[in-house]
């Protein structure tokens, strides 16, 4: 009697609220994943993303058995869900929590890895798949598909490595891996969108320039939009001072304006990732000093919590999607063909990553040879940077679904094959490379070496000229010759130490003009960030 009543209530609830049961189940599994991840915190081989994937795969297996092989999914994947609801908190938190001093000290290196590196990787993967796929009997992809594949598999997921590295012990390495991860994702999505605008029916010699032009337009306008929203938020919080009456309001303003920046970028067909990242950086630099101490602490925990839940949610879905038999049956490839295509993609990912990490690292060391900062990228660091970018994650999955499915569903055998191969590559790189990350980092950077590296990273810059950061760039109270000599010395310094010089003059401009308007303590009172 009780069983019949329970079944009746369950069926009635499912009929009236069809999303209640799957959402409840997924949230319960999400909680289970958090508990298991906590228990495995000290495990040498497993990290949070691997835990989420394994729990997702186990959940998918149970659902597959309960549904008698019909489905392994709790929820149906929708790339709009990913791009609109899950990705913004992850990217914003990355910008909000970034150690700005190290990030901008290494800005040129990070941008070279995250932008130039993506272009190099995309070219290698696109042409490699175009050449090798037909040799494996996998045909039917268009030129747009091959270019999209290059951008899809150029997007990295550095979460596994960042969970192992410590930014206080290896500040340079952590800054490069973290910064490149964010810029890489943004560049991959921007380049993916630029590829979609190519008119392949009328290709000319200007097509490559058009793609590059579209990329520059999206990159620059998205960045400016994020900076603009961040500055507006900071100005509003400083001027109105919501904390006088309600700390809840000022926290709500920060959350809503951050999300608004992303939605505005999507509305204007820009890159929401870049916009919300730089909005987070600007809010952290200015807005967080215009709120009460309690709101400042709460905001950091809230943004970190939302990011953590979104990341876990995504990896859980990747685990359940691996058992989607519908796509496996629809795929045009046999089991051996699938392994061959996945192997080719993985090999090209390894090659494409190595093709820019090591040469650009050598170039960076050469350009910084006069800085006397003792922060050259050693060969061991280069290996870790290369390894950190081998794992593929949520952005690759979302872009693959966007390119090869319609609302997560495809009946085309070639498209289904690409979705399944993307899932395989993401699972393989995350699980296998993720399992090996901790032993590799511990081998290359023993604990005593890590501490020494950290101490080097905390040293001051002995060769850097000392100058009062509060002095104006030019003074009308001094003679023309004094100003001229100062400008000449500054130009010489710019040629020898470009990054340091730009950073020093930015600090002057920031203290003199920006902070009085948008908030934040004076430089001498600001803790290192």
UniProtKB/Swiss-Prot annotation:
Protein topology in the membrane: Multi-pass membrane protein
Residues exposed to the Vacuolar side: 41-45, 134-171, 236-250, 292-301, 364-380, 437-529
GO biological process terms on file: potassium ion homeostasis; potassium ion transport; regulation of pH
Domain of life: Eukaryota
Alphabetic keyword roster: Antiport, Glycoprotein, Ion transport, Membrane, Potassium, Potassium transport, Sodium, Sodium transport, Transmembrane, Transmembrane helix, Transport, Vacuole
Record topology, Cytoplasmic segments: 1-19, 67-73, 95-112, 193-214, 268-273, 323-342, 402-415
Sugar-bearing residue positions: 374
Record-annotated membrane-spanning stretches: 20-40, 46-66, 113-133, 172-192, 215-235, 251-267, 274-291, 302-322, 343-363, 381-401, 416-436
Stored Gene3D superfamilies: 1.20.1530.20
Gene Ontology cellular component terms for the protein in this record: plasma membrane; vacuolar membrane
Pfam families xref list: Na_H_Exchanger (PF00999)
GO molecular function, one term: sodium ion transmembrane transporter activity
Intramembrane residues: 74-94
Chief location of this protein within or outside the cell: membrane
Subcellular location: Vacuole membrane
Reactions the enzyme catalyzes: Na(+)(in) + H(+)(out) = Na(+)(out) + H(+)(in); K(+)(in) + H(+)(out) = K(+)(out) + H(+)(in)
Annotated tissue distribution: Expressed at very low levels in roots and shoots.
Function of the protein: May act in low affinity electroneutral exchange of protons for cations such as Na(+) or K(+) across membranes. May also exchange Li(+) and Cs(+) with a lower affinity.
Protein family membership: Belongs to the monovalent cation:proton antiporter 1 (CPA1) transporter (TC 2.A.36) family.
Protein name (Swiss-Prot/TrEMBL): Sodium/hydrogen exchanger 4
Gene giving rise to this polypeptide: NHX4
């Amino acid at each position: 009697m009780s069983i019949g009543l329970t079944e009746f209530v369950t069926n009635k609830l499912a009929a009236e609220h069809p999303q209640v049961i799957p959402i409840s189940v997924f949230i319960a599994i999400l909680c289970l994943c958090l508990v298991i991840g906590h228990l495995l915190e000290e495990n040498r081989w497993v990290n949070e993303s691997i835990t989420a994937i394994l729990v997702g795969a186990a959940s998918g297996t149970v659902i597959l058995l309960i549904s008698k092989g019909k489905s392994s999914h709790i929820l149906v994947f929708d790339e709009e869900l990913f791009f609109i609801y899950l990705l913004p908190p992850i990217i914003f938190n990355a910008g909000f929590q970034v150690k700005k001093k190290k990030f901008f000290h290494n800005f040129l290196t990070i941008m070279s890895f995250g932008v130039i590196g993506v272009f190099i990787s995309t070219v290698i993967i696109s042409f490699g798949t175009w050449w090798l796929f037909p040799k494996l009997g996998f045909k039917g992809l268009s030129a747009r598909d091959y270019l999209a594949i290059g951008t899809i598999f150029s997007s990295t997921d550095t979460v596994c490595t960042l969970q192992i590295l410590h930014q206080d012990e290896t500040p340079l390495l952590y800054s490069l891996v973290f910064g490149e991860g964010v810029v890489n994702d943004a560049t991959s999505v921007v380049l993916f969108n630029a590829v979609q605008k190519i008119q392949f029916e009328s290709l000319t010699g200007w097509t490559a320039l058009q793609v590059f032009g579209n990329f520059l337009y999206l990159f620059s306008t998205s960045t400016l939009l994020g900076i603009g929203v961040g500055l507006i938020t900071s100005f509003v919080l400083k001027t109105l001072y919501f904390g006088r009456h309600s700390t809840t309001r000022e926290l709500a303003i920060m959350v809503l304006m951050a999300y608004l920046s992303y939605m505005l970028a999507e509305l204007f067909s820009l890159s929401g990732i870049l916009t919300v990242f730089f909005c987070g950086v600007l809010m952290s630099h200015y807005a967080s000093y215009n709120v009460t101490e309690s709101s400042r602490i709460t905001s950091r925990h809230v943004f970190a919590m939302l990011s953590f839940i979104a990341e876990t949610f995504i990896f859980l879905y990747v685990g359940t999607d691996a058992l989607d038999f519908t796509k496996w049956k629809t795929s045009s490839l046999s089991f051996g063909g699938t392994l061959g295509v996945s192997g080719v993609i993985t090999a090209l990912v390894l090659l494409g990553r190595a093709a820019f990490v090591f040469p650009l690292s050598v170039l960076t060391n050469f350009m910084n040879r006069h800085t006397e900062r003792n922060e050259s990228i050693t060969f061991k660091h280069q290996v870790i940077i290369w390894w950190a970018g081998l794992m593929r994650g949520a952005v690759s999955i979302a872009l693959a679904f966007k390119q090869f499915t319609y609302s997560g569903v495809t009946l085309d055998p070639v498209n289904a094959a690409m979705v399944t191969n993307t899932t395989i590559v993401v699972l393989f790189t995350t699980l296998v490379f993720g399992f090996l990350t901790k032993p590799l980092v511990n081998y290359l950077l023993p604990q005593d070496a890590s501490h020494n590296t950290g101490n080097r990273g905390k040293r001051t810059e002995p060769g850097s000229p000392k100058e009062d950061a509060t002095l104006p760039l030019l003074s009308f109270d001094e003679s023309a010759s004094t100003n001229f000599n100062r400008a000449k010395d500054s130009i010489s310094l710019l040629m020898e130490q470009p990054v340091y010089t730009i950073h020093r003059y930015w600090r002057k401009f920031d203290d003199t003009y920006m902070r009085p308007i948008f908030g934040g303590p004076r430089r001498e009172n600001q803790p290192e960030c």
